[in-house]
Swiss-Prot record:
One of its GO terms (cellular component) is receptor complex. Changing V280A: Abolished ubiquitination and degradation by UBR5. Residues 11-24, 49-58, 78-104 have a biased composition (Polar residues). It comes from Homo sapiens. Composed of three domains: a modulating N-terminal domain (AF1 domain), a DNA-binding domain and a C-terminal ligand-binding domain (AF2 domain). Residues 348-368 are annotated as: Required for nuclear export. InterPro entries: NHR-like_dom_sf (IPR035500), Nuc_recep-AF1 (IPR021780), Nucl_hrmn_rcpt_lig-bd (IPR000536), Nuclear_hormone_rcpt_NR2 (IPR050274), Nuclear_hrmn_rcpt (IPR001723), Retinoid-X_rcpt/HNF4 (IPR000003), Znf_hrmn_rcpt (IPR001628), Znf_NHR/GATA (IPR013088). This is Retinoic acid receptor RXR-alpha.
């Protein structure tokens, strides 16, 4: 079932008018309803709202999703190019040609500290090309030019360690030890002197280290730039601005008898209806959301309202044992949910969302980023520019990853663990909608205006 277009007629209308009206930080003006979404969409039941109808630029849609514009100039990130090192080296002195060999593995030249390299004669006489395939230090197979000299990985690593750690060596013999593939590790002093004699440059190692340092600094700058474009501080502010003041209710309701006569399904539906109003207020505080076309704003809210609400009450319920805490301040115990016939989906919420959030101590900034990822869904049907929405989602990803690395450096897998909650959230959201449709169908559960409109909106099956 595709639930992406579940914003009902009047609800979408209210969304539109809210999207076009400025908001204050302190209070929220009650949105008004409009009888239709546009051609082909009718509202059975003719639900009425006490709030006056506001005009909207889309197909006669009127109020609840107002959005304040929050233009932010795009920030570009520059990735510096890595400088290349160029070193000219003289070819080693060549003498005493040997018989030709078929492989460099067969080469065992007696290389001494004097740097004389004995290699076979090359039929073409192009000795420079031949020396590229062997290490100028020990005669092993060369992996390329390192610090100015063609050398193997072993000699390259030895020279780099020596320079970076500023090591000093002593020779036990006459400082003229044979350095070849088999004996290169016997005398570090002579091996290092051979590296210098063949042209390896200490400054090249230092420059390489500086480039690595510059890359790390650029990564930090890129992280900072990503956060400036989608600041997690503003996402947190959005969460705090619409957070229900349930703290005063928690203790009073924690002791509720699990067999309370209050119908948990009714309580949940009433809380959802209440939260639909604040969902608009939250969305327009998310960076760049209000810069999208009004039609796209409505589509995105239609597509994600159920997952957005479930994520909120799941995180709010972290401190609750075997139950969830609703926006109305009511505590619904799992036993009550089982008695009402919704125990299976209720248990999934507790185990796949609430418990996981509790175990990792998910904070409100992370919750807000996950909800913003849900909001910016480029797969929502009917978007005028899905690529733009996808770009905004990518910015949230980048900001969340940077936040996790900065706030929880000892948890390198935290970002991935957060994203793993999204598939569960999606699956649970779809199942909850199935239950809501069932309750609406049998008609024995009071469903308030806003939520009813959401369920009456046209939808598509997937």
């Amino acid at each position: 079932m595709d639930t992406k277009h579940f914003l009902p007629l009047d609800f979408s209308t209210q969304v539109n008018s809210s999207l076009t009206s400025p908001t204050g930080r302190g209070s929220m003006a009650a949105p008004s309803l409009h009888p239709s979404l546009g051609p082909g969409i009718g509202s059975p039941g003719q639900l009425h709202s006490p709030i006056s109808t506001l005009s909207s630029p889309i197909n006669g849609m009127g109020p609840p999703f107002s959005v304040i514009s929050s233009p932010m100039g795009p920030h570009s990130m520059s990735v510096p190019t890595t400088p290349t090192l160029g070193f000219s080296t003289g070819s080693p002195q060549l003498s005493s040609p040997m018989n030709p060999v078929s492989s460099s593995e067969d080469i065992k030249p007696p290389l001494g500290l004097n740097g004389v390299l004995k290699v076979p004669a090359h039929p073409s006489g192009n000795m420079a090309s031949f020396t590229k395939h062997i290490c100028a230090i020990c005669g092993d197979r060369s992996s390329g030019k390192h610090y100015g000299v063609y050398s193997c990985e072993g000699c390259k690593g030895f020279f780099k360690r020596t320079v970076r750690k500023d090591l000093t060596y002593t020779c036990r013999d006459n400082k003229d030890c044979l350095i070849d593939k088999r004996q290169r590790n016997r005398c570090q002093y002579c091996r290092y002197q051979k590296c210098l004699a063949m042209g390896m440059k200490r400054e090249a190692v230092q420059e390489e280290r500086q480039r690595g340092k510059d890359r790390n600094e650029n990564e930090v700058e890129s992280t900072s730039s990503a956060n400036e474009d989608m600041p997690v501080e503003r996402i947190l502010e959005a969460e705090l601005a619409v957070e229900p003041k349930t703290e005063t209710y928690v203790e009073a309701n924690m002791g509720l008898n699990p067999s309370s006569p209050n119908d948990p399904v009714t309580n949940i539906c009433q809380a959802a209806d209440k939260q639909l109003f604040t969902l608009v207020e939250w969305a327009k505080r998310i960076p760049h959301f209000s810069e999208l076309p009004l039609d796209d704003q409505v589509i995105l809210l239609r597509a994600g309202w159920n997952e957005l609400l479930i994520a909120s009450f799941s995180h709010r319920s972290i401190a609750v044992k075997d139950g969830i805490l609703l926006a109305t301040g009511l505590h619904v115990h799992r036993n009550s949910a089982h008695s009402a016939g919704v125990g299976a989906i209720f248990d999934r919420v507790l185990t796949e969302l609430v418990s996981k959030m509790r175990d990792m101590q998910m904070d409100k900034t992370e919750l807000g980023c996950l909800r913003a990822i849900v909001l910016f869904n480029p797969d929502s049907k009917g978007l005028s520019n899905p690529a733009e929405v996808e770009a905004l989602r990518e910015k949230v990803y980048a900001s969340l990853e940077a936040y996790c690395k900065h706030k929880y450096p000892e948890q390198p897998g935290r970002f991935a663990k957060l994203l793993l909650r999204l598939p569960a959230l999606r699956s649970i959201g779809l199942k909850c909608l199935e239950h809501l449709f069932f309750f609406k169908l049998i008609g024995d559960t009071p469903i308030d205006t806003f939520l009813m409109e959401m369920l009456e909106a046209p939808h598509q099956m997937t």
